[in-house]
Amino acid sequence: MHDDDEALALHALGWILADEPRAERLLGLTGLSPDGLRASLGQRATLAAVLSFLAGHEADLVACAAALDIEPDRLAAAAHRLEGPESPERIHA
């Protein structure tokens, strides 16, 4: 895993949380509570969920990438790496 992916996920999370409806949608879709999100910020699965949330909503993905001054595909690629099969925390459905 790239440490940059974790940093990128945290920056993206900051962008998400700056907008209350978007933050509520993240919590609703991930099933996390605000306390649960805070407690799990160091976990790869949580960071992957943050980036996957963006990757699943193209308008948010593009807007977040613009705000972070990066290409949207960097966010999507980071999500893919964080979700990778090498992750011991990956939840298999």
Residue ranges of predicted features:
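Metal- and O2-centered redox machinery and metal/ROS homeostasis
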Residues: 1-93
